Swiss-Prot record:
The modification N6-acetyllysine is found at K6. This is Adrenodoxin. Its cofactor is [2Fe-2S] cluster. It comes from Ovis aries (Sheep). GO terms for cellular component: mitochondrial matrix. The modification N6-succinyllysine is found at K6, K98. SUPFAM superfamilies: 2Fe-2S ferredoxin-like.
Length: 128
């Protein structure tokens, strides 16, 4: 495929390290993480079936405003995510567009899997 069908995405991982990768327009951010084997711990546990909240990402404001409207299903799942912000979405629901080229998304410090009641985040009670 030609390079113009790809966009660059920067993921700021939990440890603050930036992972820069490319994804195909139309792929979800979960696809991008999986296909590029990005080392984001626990990301995408349910493989995009909207059964967990591990692909929770925090977007830049100007990107967030252009995202597709959120569905009730995604909203319900986001409610279960730790460190929820007003710019949070689930990566499995967000598909790449050319407008997202070179965007930066942040992986929240704590991850919760809605399928488990186990507290995986060390500081989940702290609100940023």
């Amino acid at each position: 495929s030609s390079s113009e069908d790809k966009v660059t995405v920067n993921f700021i991982n939990r440890d603050g390290e930036t992972l820069t990768t490319k994804g195909k327009v139309g792929d979800s951010l979960l696809d991008v993480v999986v296909e590029n084997n990005l080392d984001i711990d626990g990301f995408g546990a349910c493989e995009g079936t909207l059964a967990c909240s591990t692909c929770h990402l925090i977007f830049e404001q100007h990107i967030y405003e252009k995202l597709e409207a959120i569905t009730d299903e995604e909203n319900d799942m986001l409610d279960l995510a730790y460190g929820l912000t007003d710019r949070s979405r689930l990566g499995c629901q967000i598909c790449l567009t050319k407008a997202m080229d070179n965007m930066t998304v942040r992986v929240p410090d704590a991850v919760s899997d809605a399928r488990e009641s186990i507290d995986m985040g060390m500081n989940s009670s702290k609100i940023e």
